[in-house]
């Protein structure tokens, strides 16, 4: 087999630079494999992952294998111009003499589904993931009280202090986005159906209207889906901007996360210490930090937009976890 590969390469790859038998892995899921070779054209700065097969026919499993090789190879090369999720590939079938040249692409959300399915089938776990997330809600967290008698209030935590009752009232979630910091894998990006009416103020801030929430998943459905997606995660970091004061509290109140399974990191505390010594933050909200660093605005207060902005800020500051 290897003699056939070497002969093929010698006869057909005179100009290209060939790297063969490249070991690839994705350590956070313990995925590993070996690419037969990568053909490179230094002049054009292009490269193609090539697989050698000796089979009767090329089917979907070989395309899937290449997609996984591509992900594992380029996730360790974050500065590469090549994408984790789409690329051109080549399969050489020595049995038939046919060379297949094709492109494969997958969304970051579907790529996570593929990896999660592999984890379930193979008994693997995602370890040490850094998930950036954001919530859009129907309002702020409110504190009410004191009350002489224990009140009954929806979406609230009641506590007793100094012979009085107090209530912490939580808003409803109307959008949730979760993305892996290193690879951009999308774990969730969904609108959430609310039971209460969206105020005009919230509609103006977020751009989310009541019509957009019609037919969307309920919070209970989101909880089931998120539980299924994260059940194979261990030692996971959940990163949110101002998370300790807002997002983390809401996630825990609605029991969307298991506090024994995750560790919360508030980037409001992380970002300032990574600024250059001669540069201080004018303001600490996400939009202000983004504008200070990039001199442009982004469409804030949509969950995935906020997540992407936060990731861009942290990568610009070379923050690692």
UniProtKB/Swiss-Prot annotation:
Lineage, uppermost ranks: Viruses, Varidnaviria, Bamfordvirae, Nucleocytoviricota, Megaviricetes
Gene3D superfamilies the UniProt entry points to: 3.90.320.10, Ribonuclease H-like superfamily/Ribonuclease H (3.30.420.10)
Domain of life assignment: Viruses
Matches recorded under SMART domains: EXOIII
Exonuclease domain boundaries: 130-314
Protein's name according to its UniProt entry: Uncharacterized exonuclease R569
Species assigned in the record: Acanthamoeba polyphaga mimivirus (APMV)
Enzyme Commission designation: 3.1.-.-
Record keywords: Exonuclease, Hydrolase, Nuclease
Keyword hit for Nuclease: yes
